């Protein structure tokens, strides 16, 4: 936060407030369910056509109901889901293309958004890096915890960070550079 006359770190102040609300059990339970991106992503991906139809902002049937029950503004654009996640695609095609002898290697943590809502971004990133003669590996142990951070759930974020950092450190020890998409 740039310096200003009140010298308040507003983002951290909001995080502390949300954490305090959580401790007092005054946080929004619906928001807690929406932040379970892996559970939601796995489920919604199986029904992506129906989910995408029902979450379109132009849908005059379902969006007013979502606004009433979930407090999601009916005009808000929501991310699409795909019937195959990025990890599903990668399990089917682990090829690296034609790589010359290379020592350049990258491990990509795609984030839950790319995995469930934009798998093409991950596939294109792999393709571009392979064209640049860079070996690419992906790992996805689960959501990084950013949605929980927004809700002040510091414990969940810390638990997820521990798992992610343990996995990443193994790649770093082998000489991989780390890249995260979105």
Question: What is each residue range found by the language model?
Answer:
Residues 1-143, 148-182:
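Iron-sulfur-cluster electron-transfer modules
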């Amino acid at each position: 936060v740039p310096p200003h006359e009140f010298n308040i770190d507003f983002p951290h102040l909001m995080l502390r407030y949300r954490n305090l609300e959580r401790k007092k059990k005054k946080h929004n339970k619906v928001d807690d369910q929406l932040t379970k991106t892996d559970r939601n992503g796995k489920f919604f991906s199986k029904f992506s056509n129906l989910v995408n139809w029902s979450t379109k902002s132009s849908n005059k049937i379902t969006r007013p109901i979502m606004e009433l029950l979930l407090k999601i503004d009916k005009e808000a654009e929501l991310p699409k889901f795909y019937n195959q996640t990025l990890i599903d695609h990668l399990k089917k095609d682990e090829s690296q293309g034609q790589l010359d002898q290379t020592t350049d290697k990258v491990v990509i943590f795609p984030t839950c958004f790319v995995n469930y809502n934009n798998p093409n971004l991950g596939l294109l990133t792999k393709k571009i890096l392979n064209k640049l003669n860079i070996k690419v590996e992906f790992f996805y142990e689960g959501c990084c915890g950013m949605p929980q951070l927004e809700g002040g759930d510091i414990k969940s974020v810390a638990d997820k960070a521990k798992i992610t950092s343990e996995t990443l450190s193994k790649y770093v020890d082998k000489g991989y550079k780390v890249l995260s998409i979105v």
